[in-house]
């Protein structure tokens, strides 16, 4: 019995040793995915299926509508994860984006420009 007690007194401190270092600091980062539902610019591109979202298209897609959509999406993205972090998401995946130019407009918007986001973009055909 005495040997068991001595053994426990010797082993237990090693198991709790790692828990003594309370100086470790952790940061929380947010990763998000957002379907922005047809983020198109107003320029008609014959290589894409954007005819509805042009000034002459069925949706009468204007610069005013485009800028408002950019502003609204930027606001939502900037608020993702704010309850647990002091910044917006570290990584964001977006779908239904027409081209790289709309992503550039989005990250240059008032709500997102301070985050210094970069862009990794791939064009893929969408033949709806």
Which residues fall in each region the model found?
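Bacterial Sec-dependent N-terminal signal peptides
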Residues: 1-22
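Short, solvent-exposed loop/turn segments at the edges of secondary structure
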Residues: 4, 127-128
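N-terminal, active-site-proximal structural segment of metallo-dependent hydrolase catalytic domains
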Residues: 16-110, 116-127
């Amino acid at each position: 019995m005495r040997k068991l007690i001595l053994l426990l007194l010797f082993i237990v401190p090693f198991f709790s040793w790692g828990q003594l270092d309370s100086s470790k600091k952790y940061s929380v980062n947010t990763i998000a995915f957002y379907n922005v539902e047809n983020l198109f610019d107003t320029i008609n591109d014959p290589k894409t299926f954007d005819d509805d979202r042009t000034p002459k298209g069925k949706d009468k897609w204007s610069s005013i509508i485009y800028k408002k959509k950019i502003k609204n999406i930027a606001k939502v993205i900037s608020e993702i994860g704010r309850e647990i972090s002091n910044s917006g998401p570290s990584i964001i995946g977006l779908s239904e984006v027409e081209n790289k130019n709309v992503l550039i407009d989005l990250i240059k918007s008032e709500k997102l420009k301070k985050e210094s986001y970069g862009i990794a973009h791939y064009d893929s055909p969408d033949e709806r």
